[in-house]
């Protein structure tokens, strides 16, 4: 069974991947079963996302808004409670072998008077639990990048130089990250 699972994982894009030999068959089944459920959920999502190239593993209670603005590569894992608000000028492009773990929020637009630019996530990227990516200016995440839990990225800051004006009246500065 381990040989088959190793082969499947390698076909999904994880070269030279080998399951730990100390895992029992029962433990392996307990790990694989939820992945099968996620793949079924992902299959339904891929019907609604027209720009999808491969298997999507979709967690529970995941919210993806503006699906027409998203393109997904091969073997993408989107964990439980992930929120992706993809409304932006250039959309959200997620590469191959990308994992976005639970409770992560990707927010591409805050107000509709000025849409966010867009987000590109490269290949072989891992985004840990509880991350926040605010896309106002263009955000580009390269290949082979790993974000630990709780990483936050902001591509916009409020101007605050005039002490006689409220901060929300002074505008914003956007800069790509």
Enumerate the predicted regions with their spans.
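Terminal amphipathic alpha-helical/low-complexity segments used for targeting or macromolecular assembly
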Residues: 1-55, 144, 150-151, 155-171
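Long amphipathic N-terminal alpha/beta scaffold segment
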Residues: 51, 57-66
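Short Pro/Gly-enriched beta-strand edge/turn motifs at strand-loop
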Residues: 56-57, 79
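Flexible, glycine/small-residue-enriched loop-and-beta-strand segment within the central core
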Residues: 63, 67-71, 77-177
